[in-house]
Amino acid sequence: MLKITKICLASSATSTAQRSIALTAPRAIDQKWRAAKGLPENPNAFGPLTNLPDYTYLDGRPTPLGANQKRRLIKQQEIATRIVELSGELEFAKQRHERLKANAESEKQRLIRSKLKPKGHFLLKK
């Protein structure tokens, strides 16, 4: 018995066990079907369950915004202001580029006009 145990221990020490590690997480949602239907990848990111209030008053009073609704609204407002700011900067950069291009062209024309002056008998004809 002791001899068998020693053999088992010796053989287990020399053999190495290989372990595979999965590097990608499995997708629980069929993404191809959702893309074909025009739906977002995450069904909880957008839709009536996330955008509409949880309840309504029967007398028609507006329902207060939920915490996540308020957070999403504030985030969307920040994104909108950032878009307006960046589009203004882009328009300014376009105008500046056109202005610099026109200035460079006029400077080039001025240099050409100053270099090419009539000389000799062409100067006397005027």
Curated annotation (Swiss-Prot):
Organelle targeting peptide span: 1-28
Query: Which BP terms in the Gene Ontology apply to this protein?
Result: mitochondrial translation; translation
Signal sequence region: none
Pfam families per the record? MRPL52 (PF18699)
Q: Organism's domain of life?
A: Eukaryota
One Gene Ontology cellular component annotation? mitochondrial large ribosomal subunit
Tell where it localizes.
Answer: Mitochondrion
| Keywords of the record | Mitochondrion, Ribonucleoprotein, Ribosomal protein, Transit peptide
Q: Which GO terms describe its molecular function?
A: structural constituent of ribosome
* Family assignment from sequence similarity: Belongs to the mitochondrion-specific ribosomal protein mL52 family.
Q: How does it assemble?
A: Component of the mitochondrial ribosome large subunit (39S) which comprises a 16S rRNA and about 50 distinct proteins.
- Protein name per the record: Large ribosomal subunit protein mL52
Specify the species.
Drosophila melanogaster (Fruit fly)
UniProt gene name:
mRpL52
